[in-house]
């Protein structure tokens, strides 16, 4: 034994140790994971277990939902184009139909006209159509607020915006009433965070969004995403994830980053789901494997780095 090279000596010593003290070896591995989970928690990143640490360490594909993850999720109204009504009337109609919605665009509409609650508002039969918008009875009028697909499904033609931006179209009792353009800002630190993730071993960055291609493409290009899927309905996002999962390597994993609320089904379809801004969100705690308490996207590469140290 003493004539062997030192690496071979070390290997033989490890074999003897594991055979003699298997429990100690198991404990040391578990302690490494526990230490990593503790280190992440100090940064406001909560990991549900050892398997989640391992899945993060193996991640080579990371999929991002756009709104509230890559962007701030705080929309501002940039342009109002009314048809046969005033700008104020168009905004009020849209905000009223969206009075119960938790979508960031709905918040922007309500803020624009000063709606704070649904109290004393005559809004009934509200239906949120995933990937489309909402329909509601406002007063005694049927209102649709959403994208072109929603209105066209009900035989209503939309006027295409002459300016850039995400368009919210409005129709009342089957008649087109105009559109509202909104914009969101890229989250601070997003570019640096994505570049750091590449250094940590993420080989493919994917952006999924319901936004039209003309809005999503400049953002994806600016942040150097490898793959963009735009104008997606919720079921389209599931299909995109299924494709990525079926084409991953045998020793790699797919991670999805979202808010854990609007994308709960997506979190459950990947190897590791990461929820941003999870503080106070019961849905995020239920669906995600990793919870980033705030929305600091710069913590993602830190989480990946910590997971690799444990594996």
Where on the chain are the PLM-derived regions?
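Hydrophobic alpha-helical transmembrane segments
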Residues: 1-64, 220-221, 226-230, 298-300, ...
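Cytosolic catalytic headpiece
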Residues: 48-272
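Re-entrant/interfacial helical elements at transmembrane boundaries that shape
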Residues: 27-38, 76-79, 108-112, 287
């Amino acid at each position: 034994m003493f004539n062997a090279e030192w690496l071979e000596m070390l290997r033989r010593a490890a074999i003897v140790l594991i055979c003699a003290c298997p429990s100690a070896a198991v404990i040391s591995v578990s302690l490494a994971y526990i230490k990593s989970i503790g280190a992440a928690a100090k940064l406001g990143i909560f990991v549900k277990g050892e398997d989640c640490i391992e899945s993060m360490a193996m991640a080579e594909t990371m999929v991002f939902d756009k709104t509230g993850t890559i962007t701030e999720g705080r929309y501002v109204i940039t342009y109002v184009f009314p048809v046969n009504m005033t700008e104020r009337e168009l905004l009020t109609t849209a905000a009223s139909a969206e009075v119960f919605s938790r979508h960031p665009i709905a918040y922007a509409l309500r803020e624009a006209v000063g709606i704070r609650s649904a109290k004393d508002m005559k809004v009934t039969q509200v239906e949120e159509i995933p990937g489309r918008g909402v329909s509601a009875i406002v007063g005694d009028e049927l209102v649709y607020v959403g994208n072109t697909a929603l209105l066209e499904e009900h035989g209503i033609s939309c006027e295409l915006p002459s300016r850039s931006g995400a368009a919210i179209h409005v129709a009342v009792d089957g008649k087109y009433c105009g559109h509202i353009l909104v914009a969101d800002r890229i989250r601070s630190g997003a570019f640096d965070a994505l570049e750091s993730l590449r250094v940590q071993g993420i080989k493919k960055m994917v952006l999924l969004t319901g936004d039209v291609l003309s809005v999503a493409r400049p953002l994806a290009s600016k942040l150097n995403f490898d793959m963009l899927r735009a104008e997606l309905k919720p079921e389209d996002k599931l299909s995109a994830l299924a494709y990525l999962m079926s084409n991953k390597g045998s020793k790699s994993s797919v991670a999805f980053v979202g808010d854990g609320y609007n994308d709960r089904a997506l979190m459950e379809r990947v190897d590791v789901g990461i929820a941003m801004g999870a503080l106070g969100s019961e849905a995020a705690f239920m669906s995600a494997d990793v919870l980033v308490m705030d929305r600091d996207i710069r913590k993602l590469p830190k989480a990946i780095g910590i997971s690799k140290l444990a594996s």
